[in-house]
């Protein structure tokens, strides 16, 4: 009976010592948070293991995560997966649907990224357009008009300049045959008769004003179809056209005239652009929006993934994942780190404490046996 009591007593004492030892050991992982000194001597085991080695632990955690968890290869594989493709494409589709549903304008879209489009157009837009036009004039002012126009346009004009004769004669014939043409001829005759006085009075003894006007009208109409008249018109138009082509830009427009045109054009362009920017994109560019929703979303998702994949190494170096994790861990309060580790390893820490009680009890059992037989 005495022997059994000794064994039980030793088991209980051993279990208590083993359990408390493990509890203290676990506690000493975190506490104390700072070193304590007696006179000039630091008390052993202060601070605790984790507070003492926090920077080293942060470095190792960052290294493990960068080299074994969030590796470039793993991120690249995840980025190229079908799930990532679908997620990016879905996000693009959602933004496009919002664009259509909310009737967003270009101005509203740019305002979401803190860009005042109207202000940009009125300041930078005007200055940029005027600057580009003035630079163009300075550079090309001594060149001929023909050399400044696109070759295709010059060729087209060369081929169709003769058509101007037909157009001009047809328009003149239509005008002369119209009521307005008849009235204008009569008005000019009235003025002519009034200015010439007696000479015209003698002419009116043989012909009435109406017959004179009618005769003039018929002759002018006939003249528009006369081959010689058309040849003269063609020659005049061709000569003027050739003169226009060979004229230098600064002869057609001097610097002040060009500056005035540049100012007016820049104001017109920026005003027009500003007005268009206030219209919903779906109204302004319906076909483009349809293209975005139908095809471009998939292509854009592929492009984003491709570009991210190509530049992933550079991005990861710039992000410095290891340094970021180290910095973040080092900013945590020690209380928070203790709470975090206990939450993660709570079950395991309890098992360690239980194991301390069990091992202590087993050791106490053997110590009891030794105490009985020795």
UniProtKB/Swiss-Prot annotation:
Keywords: Cell membrane, Membrane, Transmembrane, Transmembrane helix. The chain crosses the membrane at residues 4-24, 354-374. The keyword Cell membrane applies. Its main location: membrane. InterPro entries: DUF445, UCP032178. GO terms for cellular component: plasma membrane. It holds the Pfam family DUF445. Belongs to the UPF0754 family. This is UPF0754 membrane protein SaurJH9_1899.
């Amino acid at each position: 009976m005495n022997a059994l009591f000794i064994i039980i007593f030793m088991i209980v004492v051993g279990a208590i010592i083993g359990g408390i030892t493990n509890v203290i050991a676990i506690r000493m992982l975190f506490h104390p948070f700072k070193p304590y000194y007696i006179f000039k001597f630091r008390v052993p085991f202060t601070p605790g293991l984790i507070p003492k080695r926090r920077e080293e632990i942060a470095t190792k955690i960052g290294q493990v995560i960068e080299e074994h968890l969030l590796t470039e290869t793993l991120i690249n594989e995840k980025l190229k997966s079908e799930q990532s493709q679908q997620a990016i494409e879905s996000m693009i589709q959602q933004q496009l649907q919002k664009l259509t549903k909310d009737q967003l304008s270009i101005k509203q879209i740019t305002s979401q990224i803190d860009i005042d489009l109207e202000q940009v157009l009125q300041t930078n837009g005007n200055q940029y357009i005027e600057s580009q036009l003035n630079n163009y004039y300075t550079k090309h002012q001594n060149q001929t008009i023909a050399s400044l126009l696109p070759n295709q346009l010059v060729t087209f004009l060369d081929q169709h300049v003769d058509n101007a004769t037909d157009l001009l004669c047809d328009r003149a014939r239509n005008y002369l045959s119209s009521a307005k043409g008849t009235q204008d001829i009569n008005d000019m005759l009235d003025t002519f008769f009034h200015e010439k006085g007696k000479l015209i009075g003698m002419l009116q003894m043989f012909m009435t004003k109406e017959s004179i006007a009618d005769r003039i009208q018929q002759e002018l109409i006939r003249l528009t179809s006369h081959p010689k008249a058309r040849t003269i018109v063609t020659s005049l138009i061709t000569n003027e056209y050739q003169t226009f082509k060979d004229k230098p830009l600064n002869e057609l427009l001097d610097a002040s005239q060009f500056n005035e045109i540049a100012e007016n054009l820049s104001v017109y362009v920026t005003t027009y652009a500003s007005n268009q920017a206030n219209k919903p994109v779906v109204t302004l560019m319906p076909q483009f929006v349809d293209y975005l929703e139908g095809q471009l979303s998939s292509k854009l998702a592929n492009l984003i993934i491709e570009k991210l994949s190509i530049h992933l190494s550079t991005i990861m170096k710039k992000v410095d994942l290891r340094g970021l994790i180290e910095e973040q861990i080092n900013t945590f309060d020690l209380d928070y780190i203790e709470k975090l580790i206990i939450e993660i390893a709570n079950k395991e820490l309890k098992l360690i404490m239980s194991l301390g009680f069990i091992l202590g009890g087993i050791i106490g059992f053997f110590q009891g046996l030794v105490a009985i037989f020795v």
